[in-house]
Amino acid sequence: MTQDNALLQAPELTLRDGSNSRKVFIKTYGCQMNVYDSTRMSDALARDGYEPTEDMEEADLVLLNTCHIREKAAEKVYSALGRLRDMKKKKAADGREMMIGVAGCVAQAEGEEILRRAPAVDVVIGPQTYHRLPEALRRAKEGQRVVDTDYAIEDKFEHLPIAESRKIRARGVTAFLTVQEGCDKFCTFCVVPYTRGSEVSRPVAQIVEEAEKLVEGGVREITLLGQNVNAWHGAGPRGEAWSLGDLLYRLAEIPGLARLRYTTSHPRDMDDRLIDAHRDLRALMPYLHLPVQSGSDRILKAMNRRHTAAEYLSLIARIRTVRPDIALSGDFITGFPGETDADFEDTLRLVEEVRYAQAFSFKYSTRPGTPGAELKDQVPEQIKAERLERLQALLLKQQQEFAESCIGKEIDLLLEKPGRMPEQLIGRSPWLQSVNVDAKASQIGDIIKVRITGTGNNSLFAERAEAAV
């Protein structure tokens, strides 16, 4: 799951207890799913009287919702915990209590080690057990130091409240909705199967209920989330087997839900029904994040991706046949163990053929406990960096070319937030680009017709073309 998409970066979520004046600050690291998880933890804590603060200094509870994907992720968390230890000590000297919690994938991976290395931490809770966070905090209040990272037998989502409409409305007109968690693919570079567990799909009724609540709260665009979201499966109303495509058709029936997206996908799980949904559903935006990681069959095999470059390109061609205006995004890793110059050139050729509107690329870094960490022929850091620089230059060129190709097009723009200038609003294009427009007499949540007039560093500019819808 990509971690650097501008649309999907979350604010730092916070909470406060009106009766007891308890406040909580949640710092979110990493992917979109952590953003969603922070929101759900926020809602769960609200039942115990916590409400938001944007000032860590005044928080009674500081919660780090962590990510374990990047290199040295755990060390960065320990560094942050060192600063929090000092803050906790200072507050204690002033007669004020502050609790510290660590959640997310570093919590899952490190467990008891966090309490050993960071004694100031009160609670460590994993991504599959955060519905038990309020109980863990109660135990910590009684003097226990709590580690709860065992995979829950119960469905955590059944125990998590859905926010009231007023809170949903305050969060904006776009929302995330997790429908699937975990991964069974076991790519040799990836820690997700070890930190998030095996693939689990939420039931249809549960997903539809949450989506309807979001729409009632003013949400107009929902992004379905999963570590491998297109592996989602469930039972339809007559007990028939459903895939993600079927779920999208059902969600598109919800009145008031104007837009749907989903991320992140695996090429092996792009079935016919999902491709049909891209053809048929006006609400499903023409944007697809479909990681490939490498253009070399040899490296793809070493990564355990279970597809070839040709199969990936064939899939892209099928999708573009049914949805010619679709914008493609991807993930790439340079310097995977054993990658030669020829392998890297294969990756560049694949990028040239696909022509991405956006992509994310990283140097390979060993993740302890993954098969990739045990492979020989590790690529020198300098070569990894040189290849990454070449790849990113090509991807940036393609991104700029895609943005320039939008000039002159009329598009539907969902208005999301105020701009920097008076009467300016910022929205998202169907292709996930940030668009600035003078939208006098329009409101956040409107979908208006605009004409793209220019490009900026990371955004587009537009003029009004029609009235709001």
Swiss-Prot record:
Binding residues annotated for [4Fe-4S] cluster 2, in chain numbering: C183, C187, C190
Subunit organization: Monomer.
Superkingdom to which the source organism belongs: Bacteria
Described purpose of this protein according to its UniProt entry: Catalyzes the methylthiolation of N6-(dimethylallyl)adenosine (i(6)A), leading to the formation of 2-methylthio-N6-(dimethylallyl)adenosine (ms(2)i(6)A) at position 37 in tRNAs that read codons beginning with uridine.
Cofactor: [4Fe-4S] cluster
Ranges where the MTTase N-terminal domain occurs: 22-142
Protein name: tRNA-2-methylthio-N(6)-dimethylallyladenosine synthase
UniProt GO cellular component terms: cytosol
Cofactor comment: Binds 2 [4Fe-4S] clusters. One cluster is coordinated with 3 cysteines and an exchangeable S-adenosyl-L-methionine.
Disulphides: none
Ranges of residues in domain TRAM: 404-466
Cell location: Cytoplasm
Membrane-spanning segments: none
Cross-referenced Gene3D superfamilies: Methylthiotransferase, N-terminal domain, tm_1862 like domain
This protein's record includes keyword tRNA processing: yes
Documented EC number(s): 2.8.4.3
Molecular function per GO: 4 iron, 4 sulfur cluster binding; metal ion binding; N6-isopentenyladenosine methylthiotransferase activity
InterPro entries to which the protein is assigned, alphabetical: Elp3/MiaA/NifB-like_rSAM (IPR006638), Methylthiotransferase (IPR005839), Methylthiotransferase_CS (IPR020612), Methylthiotransferase_N (IPR013848), Methylthiotransferase_N_sf (IPR038135), MiaB_methiolase (IPR006463), rSAM (IPR007197), rSAM_horseshoe (IPR023404)
The reaction(s) this protein catalyses: N(6)-dimethylallyladenosine(37) in tRNA + (sulfur carrier)-SH + AH2 + 2 S-adenosyl-L-methionine = 2-methylsulfanyl-N(6)-dimethylallyladenosine(37) in tRNA + (sulfur carrier)-H + 5'-deoxyadenosine + L-methionine + A + S-adenosyl-L-homocysteine + 2 H(+)
Residue intervals of the Radical SAM core domain: 169-401
Family: Belongs to the methylthiotransferase family. MiaB subfamily.
Segments forming a coiled coil: none
